Swiss-Prot record:
It is found in: Cytoplasm. Catalyzes the reversible interconversion of serine and glycine with a modified folate serving as the one-carbon carrier. Also exhibits a pteridine-independent aldolase activity toward beta-hydroxyamino acids, producing glycine and aldehydes, via a retro-aldol mechanism. This is Serine hydroxymethyltransferase. Its main location: cytoplasm. (6S)-5,6,7,8-tetrahydrofolate binds at residues 130-132, 252. Belongs to the SHMT family. The modification N6-(pyridoxal phosphate)lysine is found at residue 236. It holds the Pfam family SHMT. Its cofactor is pyridoxal 5'-phosphate. The gene is glyA. Gene3D superfamilies: Aspartate Aminotransferase, domain 1 (3.90.1150.10), Type I PLP-dependent aspartate aminotransferase-like (Major domain) (3.40.640.10). GO terms for biological process: glycine biosynthetic process from serine; tetrahydrofolate interconversion. Keywords: Amino-acid biosynthesis, Cytoplasm, One-carbon metabolism, Pyridoxal phosphate, Transferase. Pathway: Amino-acid biosynthesis; glycine biosynthesis; glycine from L-serine: step 1/1.
């Protein structure tokens, strides 16, 4: 396939060559040469990728399956209906709307459906991992919902349950939000849900980062513990196409939120996501528990290995992590911005991140790194590989080795881990071309 591009590219206009060359270079670099530890990313299987690249990316299907405002959607309707069934089964009998095109769109739909402008929302604090869409600067604020943070318990690296309960009873909000984008341990859903319901509030749990762990039964299903609504992304620990879902076990809430998804926040919902999401849902049905178990074991192994190599890893007294994430304080190595930049030069991709004790204005150069092991787990890495990754990181950030030298070793190391695991052994991708569905 590379030879094909080498022969054809010179025949194209310069501006087009530049775009295609950068796309090819990106694909080769990120997919085949780097160790990706971004906690919000993953890799679809070849079969899901083949299903993703379909004619559906050109089509519209506003509305609900079998009740569209467009013709020509008979097969889209059947696939979307199957997605709703599959995801509902994986989540223990939930009503699922797969039309949000992102986790934030899912959040916006749930927040808008359950509140009015001027209502109060009590949310998990930034220290406990709240996503930007939960804040006054993000979606909540944009919907003119008053944002009130729960107290944080630094010892347990979680919400302070007793103080949060008292706050909810005092404030009597319309909405309570748990979950987020940076958290190592499950939020206390049942305790908070009971209090929320006692004051007439609804609880929304943002499971964007942990959907794959929930489906794989390695993270509590918030719907089992009192959450009224769960929102999620379909492309983090759940290794599907980029997109979002809203799930609830209340048919009434499902109908209310669905009427907000369309037409308030979504018109067409990027239909080519649906076949790929269906493929991934079936993969998770058959392989999800193995995958989620290995993700959690790898995260713990990486945390322990990094600590052994001399890094300050958060949460040691709590066992480091129960999720796919690891948090590392790299102030001694120059701070999060410097560390992330050096690691990228070494072909190790991470993101700088605020740690619980960082002030909000440190966002451009925070104390920490947020690491996620889900994608490398998907490529077959296990506990011993986490030790190797920790050694690579130590050589760059503690020993001060030339990152370009380490990058060459990382590139060679990745050659053994290029095949997606925890999926069906069907590869419709041959030499870069799709032979199954096109």
């Amino acid at each position: 396939m590379l030879r094909f591009w080498q022969e054809k590219l010179p025949l194209l206009p310069q501006e087009l060559r530049e775009v295609l060359e950068k796309t090819i270079t990106h694909n080769l670099w990120r997919k085949y040469e780097t160790i990706n530890l971004i906690a919000s990313e993953n890799a679809m299987s070849p079969l899901a990728l083949a299903a993703y690249v379909s004619d559906m990316m050109h089509r519209y299907a506003e509305g609900k399956p079998f009740k569209r405002y467009y013709q020509g959607t008979r097969y889209v309707d059947e696939i979307e209906h199957r997605v709703m069934q599959l995801m509902g089964e994986l989540l223990g009998g939930a009503h699922v709307d797969p039309r949000p095109v992102s986790g934030t769109t899912a959040n916006a739909s749930a927040f808008r459906a359950l509140t009015n402008c001027g209502d109060k929302a009590v949310v998990a604090p930034v220290q406990a991992g709240a996503h930007v869409s939960h804040t006054k600067f993000g979606t909540l604020g944009g919907l003119c919902i008053e944002h009130i943070e729960m107290p944080y318990d630094p010892e347990n690296m979680n919400i302070d349950v007793d103080k949060a309960i008292r706050l909810i009873e005092e404030v009597r909000p319309r909405l309570v939000v748990l979950g987020g984008s940076v958290y190592l341990f499950p939020h206390p859903v049942k305790e908070i849900a009971d209090t929320a319901h006692s004051v007439g509030a609804k609880l929304v749990y943002d499971a964007a980062h942990v959907l794959g762990l929930i489906v794989g039964r390695r993270w509590r299903n918030p719907l089992d513990h009192g959450a009224d609504v769960m929102t999620a992304s379909t492309h983090k620990t759940f290794p599907g196409p980029q997109g979002g879902i809203v799930a609830t076990r209340s048919e009434e809430l499902y109908k209310t939120i669905s009427r907000v998804v369309f037409p308030v926040f979504v018109s067409n919902h990027h239909l080519h996501r649906l076949p790929a999401l269906a493929v991934t849902a079936v993969e998770m049905k058959y392989f999800g528990e193995q995958y989620a178990d290995q993700v959690v074991r790898n995260a713990k192994a990486l945390a322990e290995a990094l600590a052994a190599e001399g890094f300050k890893v958060l949460g040691e007294h709590l066992g480091y992590t129960k999720s796919h994430q690891v948090l590392v304080d790299v102030r001694a190595q120059g701070g999060g911005a410097k560390a992330a930049t050096l690691l990228e030069k070494a072909n190790i991709i991470v993101n700088k991140n605020l740690l619980p004790y960082d002030p909000p204005d440190a966002i451009k150069d925070p104390s920490g790194l947020r690491l996620g092991v889900q994608e490398m787990t998907r490529y077959g890495m296990k506990e011993d590989n986490m030790k190797d990754i920790a050694r690579f990181m130590r050589r760059v950030l503690i020993d001060g080795e030339d990152p370009e030298k380490v990058a060459r070793e990382v590139k060679e190391y990745r050659k053994e881990y290029l095949e997606v695991k925890y999926c069906f052994d069907v590869n419709p991708l041959e030499d870069g071309r799709l032979y199954l569905l096109l």
